[in-house]
Amino acid sequence: IEQIIGSTTDFASVIASCNGVDAVIHVAARPNIWSGTGEQILKDNVIGAWNVLQAAEEAKVKRVVLCSSDSVIGFTVMSGNLKRPEYLPIDTSHVLRPTDPYALSKQISETMGRSFFERGNIEIIALRPVFVLYEEMYGEVKARAKDPSNYKGPAVGGPSAAGGGPLWHYVDPRDVASAFRCALEVPVLPKFECLFISASTTLAPNPTIERMSAFSNQEYEIRRPEIYINNPFAPLYDLSETEKVIGFTPKYDLRHLLY
């Protein structure tokens, strides 16, 4: 496989990578709110996404799959900036309220994706993964589950503290790879879409609705109560739209790590 080493902020490197290919998956970015200053995150992520989209269009690439984030909703891990959802489960019609530089960079990237799609020269879709839980984080997840109130992490040698926000959302990297493959292989994308990618459960010790109500001290409008009746630990996000559009359903449930 040919490899081209460069930066997405360097258009020459990006166009060289796009020439002669049918599709592009754009994942390269500063990956979270801790990966740089606000200026650095916005500069690298926004310019990088623009260069990928512009280069793909010029190279006549047929499809681009953008990696966005569930943080565009405003459910951020930045202290003091979390926006509570207006209803549950959160679907693709939910208002976007990014409150940190990373989330804002992803919303801008989605908007650019829609703009390029509307030009009519290329198919574009954006996927919004939650916290990607790699195997080297399993020890941290177990440590947090044993003592949720006092866990600070990293406690047992993991690369960072266990993530996923207040609901302990996660998705297995194998499911992430599968979702991106589904987005590449679905025959037609008739419109621009932004789809949530998550496991079918959270890693929180208590059911989702109970935890959300206690966390925010309020009740929520539950638009699809059957989701939480059938699966009390279902994520905040409606995954049915993802299945409908690209045929993806998560396979890996890691709640066994809690016991």
Residue positions per predicted region:
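NAD(P)H-binding glycine-rich loop region in Rossmannoid oxidoreductase-like domains
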Residues: 1, 5-44
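Glycine-rich NAD(P)-binding loop of the Rossmann-fold in SDR/ketoreductase-type enzymes
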Residues: 9, 23, 40-48, 59, ...
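Catalytic helix-loop patch of NAD(P)-dependent Rossmann-fold dehydrogenases
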Residues: 43, 78-124
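Conserved catalytic Lys-bearing alpha helix of Rossmann-like short-chain dehydrogenase/reductases
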Residues: 46-52, 61, 105-113, 173-176
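Conserved Rossmann-fold NAD(P)-dependent oxidoreductase catalytic core, especially the SDR/UDP-sugar
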Residues: 51-99
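Glycine-rich "substrate-gating" loop/helix at the edge of Rossmann-like oxidoreductase active sites
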Residues: 99-102, 130-150, 154-155, 159-174
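Glycine/proline-rich active-site loop of Rossmann-fold NAD(P)-dependent oxidoreductases
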Residues: 119-123, 134-148, 161, 183-194
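Mid/C-terminal beta-alpha module of Rossmann-like enzyme folds, strongest
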Residues: 177-239, 244
